[in-house]
């Protein structure tokens, strides 16, 4: 029996070839039915097709996490298709590698719309659905840069810091409501994903920039999307039934420095 057998999960940003897709596939391989959301519908459909091809169950939807209406739609899709919602992986994010002094107001606000508003809207929409069937687990993907500052991407860092404390606040709120919903955050370090590759390109690319990111982790190399997916699986499963309001750093030692 899988570690999340029979549970229904929503994964945002699930159409990317990074953490979202890998997490969706891992949850499905452990028995979850997965609703894959992504701003790029083709990517979401590709992830769902990969799950179905391996014998799992999945549906896909074009989903803008910065839209409250979009959240109502994806929650309803989960309920209409599978009858319940047990897991929410708030994975979708925007990363612009610029110092704050070089960041435009539009860039700052857009990152907050995706990274902060998206998590806020998602939790508010998912919790009532989870309460219908006795609880659930929310995993918010923050960042190591949400715990310490990051001069090369200040707006991203501040947005992920907001996710960190919003997670703790909602965990306490759910505990007070006694609704059996756990809320935790994961803090990746430098993980080799398309989003990080784009960020490295924004900073000029090349071996020097890659070396800068590799050097952030005392372990001396970039992490993999599966490292994060394994953390999501743990926090979504009953193995973590006494864990809420926690921050799980999967970062090669980045924040230990």
Model regions and ranges:
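Canonical Rossmann dinucleotide-binding motif of NAD(H)/NADP(H)-dependent dehydrogenases/reductases
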Residues: 2-35
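Active-site helix of classical SDR
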Residues: 123, 159, 167
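Residue(s) in the substrate-gating loop at a strand-loop-helix junction
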Residues: 143
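Catalytic Tyr-X3-Lys loop
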Residues: 94, 101-121, 139, 156, ...
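Short C-terminal tail/terminal secondary-structure segment
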Residues: 18, 148, 193, 215, ...
